[in-house]
Regions:
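Intrinsic-disorder/low-complexity peptide segments enriched for small residues
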Residues: 1, 37, 80-81
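Short, charged/polar N-terminal "headpieces" of proteins
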Residues: 1-23, 28
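A generic short-segment signal for beta-strand/edge and adjacent turn/coil regions
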Residues: 1-4, 8, 32-33, 48-53, ...
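Generic structural "secondary-structure junction" signal
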Residues: 7, 41, 84-85
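Amphipathic alpha-helical interaction segments
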Residues: 13, 20, 40-41, 65, ...
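A short, structured beta-strand/loop element
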Residues: 18-44
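Acidic, low-complexity intrinsically disordered segments
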Residues: 45-87
Length: 87
């Protein structure tokens, strides 16, 4: 079953300076993190605060999901970090 993103929930995790979201491969959850630097690369004019990071995520959701799918297809692991070079 291909990776999907049926749950649009996302939140900013201040401890890791990243927006966390999940994808699903059948019944398996795949947690993803996209860090501040990666978000800044795809949305250069964003504000560096929680609302700015979440807005940058929302404005680029489809691009982020496409990149997350590519990162996921590289190999399964406990969680996945989307880095600036992935974009």
């Amino acid at each position: 079953m291909p990776l999907g993103f049926p749950n649009e929930c996302r939140f900013y995790d201040e401890a890791v300076h990243a927006v966390r979201f999940s994808g699903y491969d059948g019944a398996l959850e795949a947690p993803f993190f996209i860090g501040e630097r990666a978000l800044k690369q795809i949305q250069p004019d964003m504000s560096f605060n929680e609302s700015g990071l979440l807005k940058a995520f929302d404005l680029n959701r489809e691009r982020i999901y496409a990149t997350a799918t590519k990162v996921y297809e590289r190999g399964r692991k406990g969680s996945y970090d989307l880095l600036p070079e992935d974009f």
